[in-house]
Amino acid sequence: VLRGITLGPVATQDIIGTVDLGEFDADAGRLVTAQLVDAGDNVIETTQFVLDSTGAFTVPTKAPNGAYRLRLKASHWISNAPVVNLTGSGDSVGTQVLTNGDVDGDNSITIFDYIDLSGSFDLSTGDAGFNAEADLDGDGSVTIFDYIILSNNFDLSGL
């Protein structure tokens, strides 16, 4: 009891949704970072989860009810930050498609990503110098198809 106020356990509520890792063959097993941010872009909570074969996720939060953004980021995808209005009843952000091509992980798709991808061009898993982050389609090799993905999303930045 503090000045007549009794502090009790903070209720946990869930944010649910689905992540689709754009242009990638195997979403299952990929790590996603989720940040709950307020209107001032202050990070309230951070958690990580591993995608299953459906991409479905549940993020528990102790944040009070209100409007937030749930910033979702995976390794070589730029972040997306849908609005979520916490009401205490399993609030959903629906399906969020993350944009592929951020080879260097800086949340923007730029010439530096082309440079990193070029360093692994024509290499496959197990080859010396292979950068798994440059394998944008997840087929185990860095090919022209990875360049196409990067080119289609060039000059985009995450939220």
Residue spans of the language-model regions?
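Cellulosome-associated attachment modules in secreted, modular CAZymes
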Residues: G8-L159
